[in-house]
């Protein structure tokens, strides 16, 4: 139990900016971190929904409310996944050789091919949130998105070969086993059931299209880089979540 607690605290401090008790980082904690990735998604989703509720009752324009709700998940995660999204976009859109793309992926410099997709991403996410607010959708639906995205991304991270140059991707997989992947599958099934209860048939569409968006993102990166990494996981997660927000914004 102590090892699981340590894994949870390590995961919470790694993937969010939320304050956590001090624990010493070691291999016992690392191998349990991924088990809690969907739970981290639940925590983010709950906080996101609370902000959605508070913003919705503000006497402010829908544009201001949408802006606040759009940036909340990125702030909670410390922009961690956005960094991966930008790095991957910069590498893929460079249209260089595989070796050069891998070099760009590790480069800390930010290029135009990273900034332009980021602007597009924010426009899409803002538009989806604006539509959700305009329809006065249930705040509970926002909780689903971070759970779905993290369950699917974690499954692929644990199931696919990592890029040799990826220290972070290898680090997250250290000591994991089939039970970790099983946790992701079970979590996704439970989330699917809850999605159907809240959204009827649209719940199935939400889970399937988010999962498809993540799968296509991962497979594209495997083709471009020869494997998956922490940056690739962040890229796929961001894609999956913007797909989810757009779906919630479109469905009646």
Swiss-Prot record:
Q: Which gene encodes it?
A: cobS
The cofactor named in the record is: Mg(2+)
Which ranges does the record mark as transmembrane?
4-24, 38-58, 62-82, 113-133, 138-158, 188-208, 232-252
Compartments annotated for it: namely: Cell membrane
Pfam family, any one: CobS
User: Which superkingdom heads the taxonomic lineage of this protein's source?
Assistant: Bacteria
Q: Which reaction does it catalyse?
A: alpha-ribazole + adenosylcob(III)inamide-GDP = adenosylcob(III)alamin + GMP + H(+); alpha-ribazole 5'-phosphate + adenosylcob(III)inamide-GDP = adenosylcob(III)alamin 5'-phosphate + GMP + H(+)
EC number, UniProt record: 2.7.8.26
Pathway(s) served: Cofactor biosynthesis; adenosylcobalamin biosynthesis; adenosylcobalamin from cob(II)yrinate a,c-diamide: step 7/7
- Record's InterPro entries? CobS
- GO terms under biological process: cobalamin biosynthetic process
EC class (word)? transferase
Any one annotated GO CC term: plasma membrane
Query: What is the documented function of this protein?
Result: Joins adenosylcobinamide-GDP and alpha-ribazole to generate adenosylcobalamin (Ado-cobalamin). Also synthesizes adenosylcobalamin 5'-phosphate from adenosylcobinamide-GDP and alpha-ribazole 5'-phosphate.
What does the UniProt keyword field contain?
Answer: Cell membrane, Cobalamin biosynthesis, Magnesium, Membrane, Transferase, Transmembrane, Transmembrane helix
Please give one Gene Ontology molecular function term for this protein. Answer: adenosylcobinamide-GDP ribazoletransferase activity
Protein name per its UniProtKB record? Adenosylcobinamide-GDP ribazoletransferase
Q: How does it sit in the membrane?
A: Multi-pass membrane protein
Record-stated family: Belongs to the CobS family.
């Amino acid at each position: 139990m102590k090892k699981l607690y340590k894994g949870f605290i390590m995961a919470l401090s790694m993937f969010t900016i939320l304050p956590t008790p001090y624990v010493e980082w070691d291999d016992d904690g690392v191998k349990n971190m991924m088990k809690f990735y969907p739970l981290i998604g639940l925590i983010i989703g709950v906080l996101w929904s609370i902000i959605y509720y508070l913003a919705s009752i503000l006497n402010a324009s829908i544009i201001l409310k949408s802006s606040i709700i759009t940036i909340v998940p990125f702030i909670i995660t410390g922009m961690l996944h956005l960094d991966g999204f930008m790095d991957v976009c910069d590498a893929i859109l460079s249209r260089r050789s595989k070796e050069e793309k891998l070099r760009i992926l590790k480069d800390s410099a930010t290029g135009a091919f990273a900034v332009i997709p980021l602007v597009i991403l924010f426009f899409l996410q803002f538009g989806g949130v604006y539509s959700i607010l305009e329809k006065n959708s249930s705040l509970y639906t926002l909780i689903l998105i971070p759970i779905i995205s993290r369950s699917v991304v974690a499954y692929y991270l644990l199931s696919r070969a990592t890029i040799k140059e990826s220290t972070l991707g290898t680090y997250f997989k250290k000591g994991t086993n089939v039970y970790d992947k099983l946790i992701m599958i079970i979590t996704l099934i439970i989330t699917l059931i809850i999605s159907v209860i809240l959204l009827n048939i649209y719940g199935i569409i939400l889970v399937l299209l988010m999962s498809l968006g993540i799968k296509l993102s991962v497979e594209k990166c495997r083709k471009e880089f020869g494997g998956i990494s922490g940056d690739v996981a962040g890229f796929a997660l961001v894609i999956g979540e913007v797909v989810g927000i757009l779906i919630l914004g479109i469905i009646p």
